[in-house]
Regions:
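Short glycine-/aliphatic-rich beta-strand segments at the starts of folded cytosolic domains
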Residues: 2-16
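Helix N-cap motif at beta-to-alpha junctions
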Residues: 17-19, 52-56, 131
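Major-groove DNA-recognition helix of helix-turn-helix-type DNA-binding domains
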Residues: 96-126
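Short, intrinsically disordered low-complexity segments
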Residues: 34-70
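Short amphipathic alpha-helix segments
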Residues: 15-36
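Polyanion-binding surface elements
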Residues: 79-106
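A short, Lys/Arg-enriched interface patch at domain edges and termini
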Residues: 130-191
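Short amphipathic beta-strand starts and helix->beta connectors
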Residues: 1, 29-35, 70-72
Length: 205
């Protein structure tokens, strides 16, 4: 085992593999996914890896190549741990508390400028980008392990690209959609918010 290598745990959510596909496990094993466990959540296939590699990026990319080489109809929909996290999950990953996360979010603790939530589930559960939260934590001296930030950014990029490909037909069908969206000012506002967040991080880093 190389000194630079470690075991990385991650999971692929798959489409195109059904519980009755008896040959799927053997095909994945022969394609180099012998460090993965295939299971099902209902009819959704989950492929969990414990892969030895120098980095999470190297581990995930080699696993993606393995799934492709298996010759199945499998499509990787998402890589977990997902970028979307609740306050409880942020607390778990940081060793903080839900109350502490709430105080960061509301600006009552820390330097402020905590990333805005990306979505909500129901009336009370907010969801954030872990990549944005990890970057904020690192920039403000609350997270010492730079690998956590790098891994969070990598997973966010991977899932963004998978989603872009998955939903490409929604915008491809209407070539003027992006232009119409641009005219609302929403994209410009998002670029402004991103730029401001980057400046805030640079200023406190």
């Amino acid at each position: 085992m190389s000194k630079t290598e470690k075991t990385h745990n991650f999971l692929f959510v798959l489409d195109g593999v059904a519980p009755e596909d008896d040959g799927a496990e053997d095909a994945l094993f022969e394609a180099g996914c012998d460090d993965a466990l295939l299971s099902f959540r209902g009819t959704t296939a989950l492929l969990e890896f414990d892969r030895l590699a120098a980095s999470l990026e190297e581990a995930v990319l080699s696993a993606l190549r393995g799934v492709e080489a298996a010759g199945l109809d499998a499509v990787v929909l998402r890589v977990e741990p997902d970028d979307l996290v609740s306050a409880s999950e942020i607390a778990r990953r940081t060793g903080s508390s839900r109350e502490g996360v709430r105080l960061w979010h509301e600006g009552e603790r820390g330097p402020g400028s905590f990333p805005p939530p990306l979505a909500s589930v129901g009336a009370n559960t907010l969801l954030w980008s872990w990549a944005e939260v990890a970057n904020w934590l690192s920039a403000n001296g609350k997270l010492d392990d730079e690998a956590v930030v790098e891994n969070a950014r990598f997973l966010a990029r991977v899932n963004a690209l998978l989603n872009e490909e998955r939903y490409h037909h929604l915008t491809k069908a209407d070539s003027s959609f992006r232009d119409r969206l641009k005219k609302t000012g929403a994209l410009r506002r998002l670029r402004s918010l991103r730029s401001r967040s980057q400046k805030d991080s640079a200023g406190t880093g």
